[in-house]
C-alpha cells in the first residue's frame, strides 16, 4: 500500500516591498502598475589597478633608464673640505698659468712642473670600511728615513747645537755658591709638595715647617733661606732623643691657590704649624742656629729666643 506525502497548506507570501498599496479605486482613474524588485542593483565594475613598475623597467621611450645601484653620498669632514679647497685653488692656478702661456709662452719655459702633482690613493685603499678619508696623503717623512736631519734648522740659518753652544744656560751664582733648583728637587732635605699633598701633611699632629719660596724672584734670598733650613733640620735628624720635625717647601708661583690659602704675599716666608694651625710666621732671613732655637721653642717647650716676636705668636686654643 503506498503512502502519499502529507500535504500541508501553503502559507501566504508577504507583500512585496516597494509596492504602493491601493486603498481604493476612484471613479475614472485606473491604478498605475509599479514594478519593483527586492534585490539591489549590481554595483558598476571598478577599473583595473595599474601594475607598479620596478625601477629597472623603462617608463617609456622618452624616459631614460634608472640606475640599478644607489650612488654613494659624498663624504663630509675636514679632509674632504681641505681636498675641495685644494682642487679649487689648483684649478684657478692652472687657468692662470694657461692664460700666461697663451700670452707669452717663453715665460714658463724650462720651469718644469710648477704645481706639485696630486697624490691619490688607489681604489682598494679608498673603499669604505678602511676608516680613512678619501684622497688622504701619505706620510711625508718616515720615522726610519735615512735622510732625516739629525740637527734641524731652527730658523734664520742657525742650527740648534750652534745656538746653545754659543748661548749656554747656566745657573746663577751667589756668593760663590751656584743656585741649582733642579738638583735640590732630587737631593734636598726639604721636600717640595703641591696642593694635592697638602692635606696628608697638614692634618697630622707631628710638627710641620713650611717654607713658601719663589725660584726666580729674589732667588738669592730664597736659596739662602732654604740652605739654612736644611742645616737646622739636619741637627734634629742627627739627634736621637727626640723626633725631628717635618720640613716641606711650596713654590708660590706654581701653587698660587695654596699660597693664597696660607695668606702668604711675600717670599721667602717660614711657617711653623702644629695640627693644621699656624703658630708663627717668620718673614726675615734667619741663620741655622736661630732656626734651631725657634724649632725647640715651638715644638719642644724650650725657652723663647730673642728673635721671636711674642706679639706675632698665635694664641693657644
From Swiss-Prot:
Transit peptide location: 1-69
Chief place where the protein resides: plastid
Ranges of compositional bias, category Basic residues: 23-32
Record flagged with keyword Chloroplast: yes
UniProt biased composition (Basic and acidic residues): 48-59
Record-level GO cellular component terms: chloroplast nucleoid; chloroplast stroma
Biased composition (Low complexity): 1-10
Entries under Gene3D superfamilies matching the protein: Glutaredoxin
Record bears the keyword Manganese: no
Region (Disordered): 1-83, 114-138
Highest taxon listed in the record's lineage: Eukaryota
GO BP of this protein: chloroplast organization; regulation of DNA-templated transcription
SUBUNIT field: Component of the transcriptionally active chromosome (TAC) complexes.
The protein's name in its UniProt record: Thioredoxin-like fold domain-containing protein MRL7 homolog, chloroplastic
Organism for this UniProt entry: Oryza sativa subsp. japonica (Rice)
Gene assigned in the entry: MRL7
Amino acid at each position: 500500500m503506498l503512502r502519499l506525502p502529507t500535504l500541508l497548506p501553503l502559507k501566504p507570501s508577504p507583500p512585496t516591498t516597494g509596492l504602493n498599496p491601493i486603498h481604493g479605486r476612484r471613479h475614472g482613474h485606473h491604478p498605475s502598475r509599479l514594478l519593483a524588485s527586492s534585490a539591489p542593483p549590481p554595483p558598476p565594475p571598478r577599473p583595473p589597478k595599474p601594475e607598479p613598475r620596478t625601477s629597472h623597467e623603462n617608463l617609456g621611450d622618452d624616459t631614460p633608464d634608472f640606475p640599478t645601484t644607489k650612488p654613494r653620498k659624498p663624504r663630509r669632514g675636514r679632509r674632504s673640505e681641505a681636498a675641495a679647497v685644494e682642487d679649487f685653488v689648483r684649478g684657478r692656478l692652472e687657468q692662470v698659468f694657461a692664460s700666461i702661456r697663451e700670452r707669452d709662452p717663453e715665460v714658463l719655459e724650462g720651469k718644469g712642473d710648477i704645481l706639485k702633482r696630486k697624490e691619490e690613493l688607489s681604489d682598494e685603499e679608498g673603499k669604505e670600511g678602511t676608516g680613512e678619508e678619501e684622497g688622504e696623503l701619505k706620510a711625508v717623512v718616515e720615522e726610519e728615513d735615512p735622510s732625516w736631519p739629525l740637527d734641524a734648522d731652527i730658523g734664520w740659518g742657525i742650527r740648534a747645537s750652534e745656538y746653545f753652544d754659543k748661548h749656554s744656560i747656566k745657573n746663577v751664582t751667589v756668593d760663590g755658591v751656584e743656585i741649582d733648583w733642579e738638583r735640590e728637587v732630587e737631593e734636598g732635605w726639604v721636600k717640595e709638595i703641591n696642593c694635592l699633598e697638602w692635606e696628608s701633611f697638614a692634618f697630622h699632629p707631628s710638627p710641620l715647617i713650611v717654607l713658601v719660596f719663589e725660584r726666580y724672584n729674589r732667588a738669592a734670598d730664597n736659596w739662602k733661606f732654604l740652605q739654612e733650613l736644611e742645616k737646622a733640620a739636619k741637627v734634629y735628624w742627627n739627634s736621637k732623643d727626640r723626633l725631628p720635625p717635618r720640613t716641606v717647601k711650596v713654590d708660590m708661583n706654581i701653587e698660587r691657590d695654596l699660597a693664597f690659602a696660607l695668606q702668604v704675599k711675600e717670599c721667602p716666608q717660614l711657617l711653623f704649624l702644629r695640627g693644621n694651625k699656624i703658630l708663627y710666621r717668620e718673614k726675615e732671613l734667619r741663620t741655622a742656629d736661630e732656626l734651631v732655637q725657634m724649632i725647640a721653642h715651638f715644638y719642644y717647650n724650650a725657652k723663647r729666643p730673642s728673635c721671636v716676636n711674642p706679639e706675632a705668636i698665635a694664641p693657644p686654643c
